[in-house]
C-alpha cells in the first residue's frame, strides 16, 4: 500500500520501491533481501504485463487498426520500450559484455545531449542495477514454484486493474458485452502511457483513454466514462493508499505495532 502511494505520486513511479525497501528494513528485513524481493517482483511484473499486452494487441489488432489507428504509434512505442527493457535485462545473462557496451555507449550519447550529467556515476548505477537483476533472475530460476505463483498473481492483478473500465461501462448503463475488447484496449493504454514522466501519468492517461476508448463509449458519454475511470483508478487509489501511509507513519512515530 505504501509503495503504491509513492509510486502514484512520483514521476515514472520511481518513489515506490525505495520506500518499500525502507519499510522492509525497518521491519528487520536485511537490505539485500528487501532489494532482491522488489527486483524479483518488478521483473515478473514487467514480463507479464508486456506479454499480456502483446497478446491482446495480436488478438484485437483488427479492431485497433480499424477504429483507433491514430493511437497505434503510441501503443507500439510503449510495447517496444517494454520489450527493449526485457531484452536488455535477460540479454545481460547471455552476453554481459555486449549489453554493457550498449549501455555505456547510450550513456555517452545522453551525456553529449546533456541529459546525463555524470558519466561515471550513471555507469556505476547501471552496473549495480544490472547486477541486482542478474542475481534476481538466478533466484527466480532456482525457485520455479514461487516464480509461477508470482506470474499467476500478476496476471490476476492486471486483469482486475484493467477490468475497472468494464465496470465503468456497466455502471453507465451499457449491457452489450465488450469485456475482452475493454481489457485489451486498457492493457494497451497502460503500455502507451506507462513511461510518461508525470506523476500518475497525468495528462497522458486521460488523452490516451479518450483516443482509445472512443471505439467502446459513445462520444457523448466518453467524457463521463473518463472522469469515472480516472477517479477510481487513480484518485481513489491515492486516497486509500495515502490514508494507509499516514496511519503507518503515525503508528511508527508512536511505536504502535501495525499488526
Regions found by a protein language model. Name each.
Residues 24, 129-141:
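A short amphipathic helical element positioned immediately N-terminal to and/or at the very start
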Amino acid at each position: 500500500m505504501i509503495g503504491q502511494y509513492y509510486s502514484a505520486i512520483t514521476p515514472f513511479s520511481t518513489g515506490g520501491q525505495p520506500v518499500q525497501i525502507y519499510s522492509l528494513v525497518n521491519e528487520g528485513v536485511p537490505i539485500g533481501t528487501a532489494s532482491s524481493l522488489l527486483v524479483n517482483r518488478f521483473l515478473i511484473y514487467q514480463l507479464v504485463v508486456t506479454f499480456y499486452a502483446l497478446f491482446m494487441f495480436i488478438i484485437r489488432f483488427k479492431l485497433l487498426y480499424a477504429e483507433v489507428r491514430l493511437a497505434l504509434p503510441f501503443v507500439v512505442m510503449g510495447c517496444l520500450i517494454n520489450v527493449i527493457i526485457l531484452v536488455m535485462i535477460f540479454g545481460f545473462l547471455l552476453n554481459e559484455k555486449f549489453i554493457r557496451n550498449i549501455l555505456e555507449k547510450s550513456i555517452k550519447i545522453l551525456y553529449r545531449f546533456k541529459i546525463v550529467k555524470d558519466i561515471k556515476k550513471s555507469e556505476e548505477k547501471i552496473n549495480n542495477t544490472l547486477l541486482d537483476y542478474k542475481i534476481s533472475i538466478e533466484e527466480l530460476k532456482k525457485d520455479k514454484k514461487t516464480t509461477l505463483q508470482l506470474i499467476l498473481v500478476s496476471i490476476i492483478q492486471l486483469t482486475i486493474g484493467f477490468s475497472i473500465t468494464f465496470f465503468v461501462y456497466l455502471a453507465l448503463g451499457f449491457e452489450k458485452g465488450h469485456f475482452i475488447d475493454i481489457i485489451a484496449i486498457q492493457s494497451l493504454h497502460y503500455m502507451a502511457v506507462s513511461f510518461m514522466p508525470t506523476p500518475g501519468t497525468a495528462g497522458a492517461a486521460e488523452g490516451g483513454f479518450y483516443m482509445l476508448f472512443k471505439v467502446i463509449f459513445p462520444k457523448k458519454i466518453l467524457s463521463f466514462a473518463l472522469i469515472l475511470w480516472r477517479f477510481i483508478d487513480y484518485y481513489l487509489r491515492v486516497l486509500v493508499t495515502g490514508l494507509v501511509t499516514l496511519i503507518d507513519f503515525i503508528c511508527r512515530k508512536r511505536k504502535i505495532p501495525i499488526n
